[in-house]
Amino acid sequence: MEYYETSRQKINISNIHFSGRILDIGGGGEGVIARHSKERVVAIDIRADELAETPDLGLKIIMDACNLQFLDEYFDNITCFFSLMYMDLTQIDRFFSEAYRVLKKDGILWIWDATMPLDCSNDVFVAQLDLTISENEVITPGYGVSWFREHSAEFIEQFYIKAKFEQLELKQNSESFFLKLRKN
């Protein structure tokens, strides 16, 4: 099996302030958003073992992001921290529809993810991070996935436009991107 590893992407979320309720998609493993915003976070992950590894901060629920079991317009924020890269095209499409449904009007969808070019000559793509969660907490996680398609801010644009999200902010480089989207 051949691996492609990105350079260490420097990401700092310490200066981001979420207001209200937060749904964290793929919130297992490192529990990045829960470590940042503590008990205001509802972390969901389809894998129980990933949630078991997450620090006990906030609520943890085994759930599929393509079938969110929440009331309409319940959350103020939804976060996806290196989660979309694990979804296939049908799942991404369904996720954006579900995210739009459970976000309140003017709610924000925050996405941090890997940029994976179409040239998948390696079997596995690994995004490596230097992640600042707070002034006192820096971690160095890696996120690996089978490399089977392109993945970028431009690629997922078709899905969030279809779901009727408005792009507020885009930051990207050759190996990662950040998107801030709003439900109108």
What does each of the following model-derived ranges do?
Residues 114-163, 169:
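C-terminal alpha-helical "lid/dimerization" subdomain adjacent to the S-adenosyl-L-methionine
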Residues 77-91:
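A short SAM/SAH-binding and catalytic strip from SAM-dependent methyltransferases
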Residues 23-67:
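Class I SAM-dependent methyltransferase SAM/SAH-binding core
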Residues 163-184:
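Core SAM-dependent methyltransferase catalytic element
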Residues 106-114:
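Conserved beta-strand signature within the Rossmann-like core of class I S-adenosyl-L-methionine
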Residues 93-105:
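A short glycine-rich, Lys/Arg-flanked "PGG" loop and its adjoining helix->strand segment in the class I
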Residues 2-19:
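Conserved alpha-helix/loop element of class I SAM-dependent methyltransferases that forms part
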Residues 66-78:
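A short acidic, Gly/Pro-enriched loop at the edge of an enzyme's catalytic core
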